Amino acid sequence: GFWKKVGSAAWGGVKAAAKGAAVGGLNALAKHIQ
């Protein structure tokens, strides 16, 4: 139903944000190491 779609979209956003933060953090760490 509606709320399941809302929850799924929210979870997708959370996962995307976490992935983006992880990638950004790794890139920053790699630059710092070099």
Curated annotation (Swiss-Prot):
One of its GO terms (biological process) is defense response to Gram-positive bacterium. Keywords: Antibiotic, Antimicrobial. Has strong antibacterial activity against the Gram-positive bacteria M.luteus, S.aureus, B.megaterium, A.viridans and E.faecalis, and against the Gram-negative bacteria K.pneumoniae, E.coli DH5alpha, S.typhimurium, P.aeruginosa and E.aerogenes. Lacks hemolytic activity against sheep erythrocytes. This is Papillosin. It comes from Halocynthia papillosa.
